[in-house]
A protein has these predicted regions:
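Short active-site neighborhood of thiol/selenol oxidoreductases, capturing the structured segment around
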Residues: 64-94, 114
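Thiol-/selenol-based redox modules, centered on thioredoxin-like
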Residues: 161-238
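A local structural motif
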Residues: 46, 140-145, 170-176
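Sec/Tat-exported extracytoplasmic proteins
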Residues: 47, 71, 78-81, 86, ...
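N-terminal targeting signals for export/organelle localization
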Residues: 1-51, 55, 233-238
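Structural microenvironment flanking redox-active thiols in thiol-disulfide oxidoreductases
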Residues: 90-159
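Extracytoplasmic
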Residues: 47-49, 67-74, 109-114, 124, ...
Length: 238
């Protein structure tokens, strides 16, 4: 019934809902090096994450800053119909693997979130993003993973620019496909609780062990002096 309802809603919104790749079918590449121990290095501040209006997978309007502050965040841009094995499916499989590790680590519970945001608001409606996220998009007792989109490309553009994420239409609409192929360089951003980007991962560095040690490194940093972190009920829900 839920699947049928999702399909009906997707048609009503003018887009077909796409399921996320099956993580077990996507092998995360072996790491060719041993990452340094958490806290043995420093991650410099690269830039402040941009802000803007986004749509949650339930259709509610929010500000992006609600999902990039208050916790250590792994943020990435995706599109639901991406089939490049070194693109969005790899990011999904890597984060899925890391999510399980974080949920089994008591010291990390409640301190980390994941955010995946669509490149393509025309096709990736809230319904499509909710379908893509599947069980990962449903908040439970574990790490919360948000699947966001925007109302249109005009509102998305400043956020893409702010993150330095390029995307282009690589080809016209292929036969049998609803949308053009989007060409982009895979990037996953690590943000601290203040919304500062502290690391940017490409395919070569995107591995659960690397991400985990970087998250632990950020969480070991002392809180800024004279600054109190006040989390509202809205922020603590993310």
């Amino acid at each position: 019934m839920a699947t049928l309802l999702g399909a009906m809603l997707a048609l009503a919104f003018g887009t077909g809902a796409v399921a996320a790749p099956v993580p077990d079918a996507l092998a995360v590449p072996r790491l060719a090096f041993v990452p340094p121990a958490p806290g043995s290095y420093r991650l410099e501040r690269i830039m402040k994450a941009p802000d803007g209006i986004v749509l949650e997978s339930d259709g509610s309007l929010r500000r992006l800053s609600e999902f990039t502050t208050g916790k250590v965040t792994l943020f990435s841009f995706i599109y639901t119909y991406c089939t490049d094995p070194k693109g969005c499916p790899l990011a999904y499989a890597t984060l899925h693997s890391l999510k399980g590790t974080i949920e089994r680590t008591p010291s990390l519970r409640g301190k980390v979130r994941f955010v995946s945001m669509s490149f393509d608001p025309e096709y990736d409606t809230p319904v499509a993003m909710r379908s893509y996220g599947g069980a990962e998009a449903r908040a439970g007792n574990g790490l919360v993973w948000h699947f966001l989109t925007t109302r249109n490309s005009r509102e998305l553009a400043p956020m893409l620019e702010g993150f330095g994420q390029d995307v282009s239409v690589a080809a016209g609409k292929p036969p049998g496909q609803r949308a053009p192929v989007l060409s982009h360089l895979l990037k996953v951003y690590l943000l601290d609780g203040g919304g500062e980007v502290r690391e940017i991962y490409s395919t070569s560095w995107l591995h659960p062990a690397v991400l985990l040690n970087d998250i632990k490194t950020l969480l070991q940093e002392p809180a800024p002096r004279g600054r109190k972190t006040i989390l509202t009920s809205k922020l603590t829900s993310h």
